[in-house]
Amino acid sequence: SLVGSEMCIRDSWGGCAAAAMGFSVQVAHRIGAGDFVEAKKILRQAVTATLVFSSLLAVGGICISGMLPLWLGGDEAIWNDSSLYFRIFALFLPALQLNFLAGGMLRCSGNMRVPAMLNIMMCLLDVVFNFFLIFPTRHVEWFGVVFTAPGAGLGVKGAILGTVLAELVTTGGMMWYLCRRSPMLKFVGERGSFLPKRETLRKSFRISLPMGFEHMAICGAQIATTVVVAPLGIVAIAANSFAIIAESLCYMPGYGISEAATTLVGQSLGANRIRLLRRFANITVWSGMLIMGVMGALIYVAAPQIIGVMTPVEEIRTLGIEILRIEAFAEPMFAASIVAYGVFV
């Protein structure tokens, strides 16, 4: 049930990412054409439109959170924790939406460093907040030194609260940099309307809707897979989840190259440099396939060590290694789909 809730979270996550991308691509086109004034206008409209969208998504998520574990066929013993986890996540969807929007806008303006640094910070903060919120006050031993670590002892609630607090801090930093420091997109102190225009929304829908349906299809398939795997028992579910998490070592570089491809191709299209656009498309797709192919080979070889770090249970290890090695063969073609997706957006 917790795994199913995670899949629904990814679906919501994908919807927010798609909504942000619908405006980010338009900004990339305007920047490529040298029209920074229009780029800022689109950004202002994007803030309002995406906040409305994510708020509606949040309300829907909160409304279904109570029944979600039942629909996913989860064990009754963890229904309450699963519902609570998803409900808190849904409540903070507007913050996640602004994070996606600000990060996408900065990347499409050519700034990859700031979003990357802030998202790395978010991961670190997530670990720190979880350390203090999940567990109660306890004695901890690090490198032979024993000390008392304070803790809230909130369990599952602490896990999701740590995540959303990390999101809030990162979103604040991302929006501050975008609105006040970005050379191309800062608009604080400038006059402008935040009311979305019909033409901007129309273009956004044309870009976002296919992406949104794609995310729904992928996450729907993952949820269906979870429902199928669930009757096989906890070992099968855990092995499948650990293998998917380990596989992210491969496809995270692919998503990074995909973001770069969207920026390079979008700005080239805005500048009407079609030959350069095609060169960037070819370079990024082949680079993604090469890198993820190498990463796939590495995780195939290191699968026992990778899964071994994640769980001490021998049954889960054995099954997880098999799953991870099967997934490794798909990485080059998976890379092609990920990066080509960024190109065609």
Regions from the PLM with identified roles:
Residues 1, 5, 69-76, 132-136, ...:
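Helix-terminus/linker motif at the lipid-water interface of multi-pass membrane proteins
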Residues 100, 127-131, 159, 163, ...:
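Glycine/proline-centered helix-kink
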Residues 25, 66-67, 104, 131, ...:
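Transmembrane alpha-helix boundary and packing residues in multipass membrane permease domains
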Residues 88, 99, 122, 166-170, ...:
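Transmembrane helical elements of multi-pass membrane transporters/channels
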Residues 5-6, 10-59, 99-115, 226, ...:
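Small-residue-rich hydrophobic transmembrane alpha-helices
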Residues 114-118, 161:
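Hydrophobic alpha-helical membrane segments of integral membrane proteins
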